[in-house]
Each structure stands twice: as C-alpha cells, then as structure tokens.
Amino acid sequence: MQSGDISWLLISTALVVLMTPALGLFYGGMVRAKNVLSTITMCFVALAIVSVQWILLGYTIAFGDDVSGLTGNLVFIGLRNVSMSDYGFVAFQMAFAAITLAIIVSALAERVKLSAFLLFGILWTTFVYDPIAHWVWGGGWLAGIGALDFAGGTVVHISSGFSALALALLVGRRTGYGEYNIEPHNIPMTLLGTALLWFGWFGFNAGSALEANDVALNAFLVTNTSAAMGALSWMFASWLKGKPGSLGVASGAIAGLVAITPAAGYVDPLSALVIGGVAGVVCYAAMLLRVRAGVDESLDAWAVHGVGGLWGAIATGIFASVGATGLVAGNAQQLLLQIIAALVATAYAFLVTLILAKAVDAAVGLRVSSQEEYVGLDLSQHEEVAYT
C-alpha cells in the first residue's frame, strides 16, 4: 500500500474504534439513570473482548484460507503468518467486529449480568460474526455467488439486529415494561452519541475502500446523504403521529447510516437519497411494530440495524451502478443474490444466537435478580452510580 492509503486506513480504523464508545453514549442516554454506567460499560467491554479474541482466533476464522466456503482455516491463529503490512487491515476489521457485538447490548440493557455478557460475547463473535464475515468478505460462499456488501450491511447490521431480537425474546421484558413508561434519562447524551457515530461512520464506509481513492470519495458523500435523509424521513413520519422528537431524528440518522452501509461503494448520491429516505420510514414502522407486539428489545437494534440492514442489502441489489450493477441498471440477478444473502444471515444469526444464549443461561444465568434489577445494574453489577 502507498503511504497515503496506509494513513487513510489508520485514520478510518481510529474512527471506527471511536464508534463503540459513541454507541455506549447513544444507548446510555436511552436507559434509566440507574443503568447508564452498566450500559456504557458493556459497550466498552465489547471492544475489549473482541480486541483480544480477534488476534487470537477471530481474524483467522474470518480471513484465513477458505475451507469449503464456510470458514477460514487456522493459518492466521494468533496472527501467525500475518505480515506487518497487513496489520492495518487486521485492526480495521477488528473494529468492525467490536461494534457489531456492542450493537447487541440494545437487547441486554437494564437486565442482563455482565458475567453473562462476557461469556456470550466471546461465543457470539466466534460462532456468529466471524463465520458470516468469512462468507461475505473472506472468500466464503456468499462472496462466491456474487453477493455485495461494501461495508457491513449483512455482516454487521443484519447479524447484530436479528441477534438482538433473538436475545430480547429469550431474556424477556424488563420488570414493569408495559405497566408504566420506561423513559430515556438523558436524550442530550444520546444526541452526542449520534453525532460521534455519524462522524465515525465516514471511516466505517469510506474506509472500506481500503484506499484513498474515488470509491472512498463516493462512499463518503453517499454516507452523509443517506444519514441526512434518514433523519428527515423518520422525523416527518413521527410528525404524523404527534410532535417530532429529537430521539427520532437521531434514530433516523442511524437508520440512514445503516442502510447505506452495504451500498456505499456501489451507488450514487441520488440513489442514497432514496435509500436513506426509505430507511427512516421503514425503521420507524419496525419500531412501532415492535412496541405493538410487546417485544422489549430495549434500544431498537432490531428495528434500526436489523431492518435497516435488510433494506440496505436489498437496496444494493436495486440501485448498484458504481463498480457493480443492480436492478435499475438491468441486472435483476443481483437483487436475487442480495435477498439470498440477507435471508441467510438473518436465519443463521437468529438461530445460533438463541442456541448460544440458552447455553450461557444454563451455565451462568443471563438475568440479574428482580431485586438487582430494581436497584439498577450500576449498583448491583458495579457498585457505582453515574450521578450523585
């Protein structure tokens, strides 16, 4: 790689690493004050877990030599046989794996033990994230059939969003959910997290070009375009039911960012307007559906990341025109391939997450006690409080 490309990759890696604590702020503002430290800590712990797991095992599962299209072999275990010139790519992909695990905190907030999250995080990254990353990016079978995922719509967002749904269904509702309102305690904190996520997403998407080139420039612009349209469309959709909330603007921006992720290197800015606009409305509708169904997926990872990732994967097959072609450009087959990849990732992540979560529950128990939940996880899990 040229020195300029190395510099851009390192900057992008730092931006993506920033996204995990930014997600902690985004989530932390939406929980009650008695659980804010626990929620943010889980996101930091996700970064720590994956940083170690990736070096020891994760990278070789995802990017080792292909074995039957399903997994990488152990050629890179402990980063053995990885040249120093590839360390930037290793770190960049590690940051992706870390935030993917952190997204799942949405389904665990305010009721799950830290010890259970530690064990689950190791297992989930190894048996869900790493194999899907290999299928799509590491020369696996989805890459072989021609499925497109520029920066992680399938690998990151579908896998985490539908894993969060599986966990929410298994863990069950927070005590009092549906009986009284469980309100966010600090929306400005969530807005700060949104701003940092939006900023970091430029590294997430434009950095996935792996070079400082025209593809990165395109990805940078369409990322911002889709985020803006997502924020506006969610805001206007919610306005039809009442006042437009600041939390809706934040969620819409994230929905737009999620949806453009798989498409960022393949679509033009006009297509990004459509992708982001649809994402805001579709993800808002998914959130309303979740609430109506009584599913306590606390911070809406399923609605925003799962559904947004599904739409983004499909939209890539519709609008791709830069470096690949989709339905609009006359390639209907690409749309079919995108649907296949999205459905496979959805089913695999959901089912394997259920299995892993049941195993963790049997081993150490997932939920805190009702008394611990009542006093809050900040005190019961950390013996700390956020505010005095």
UniProtKB/Swiss-Prot annotation:
Q: InterPro entries of this UniProt entry?
A: Ammonium/urea_transptr, Ammonium_transpt, Ammonium_transpt_CS, NH4_transpt_AmtB-like_dom
Signal sequence range: none
Instruction: Answer yes or no on keyword Metal-binding.
Output: no
Q: Does the keyword Cell membrane apply?
A: yes
Q: PROSITE patterns recorded for this chain?
A: AMMONIUM_TRANSP
Q: Which family does it belong to?
A: Belongs to the ammonia transporter channel (TC 1.A.11.2) family.
* Name this protein carries in UniProt: Ammonium transporter Amt3
Protein's organism = Archaeoglobus fulgidus (strain ATCC 49558 / DSM 4304 / JCM 9628 / NBRC 100126 / VC-16)
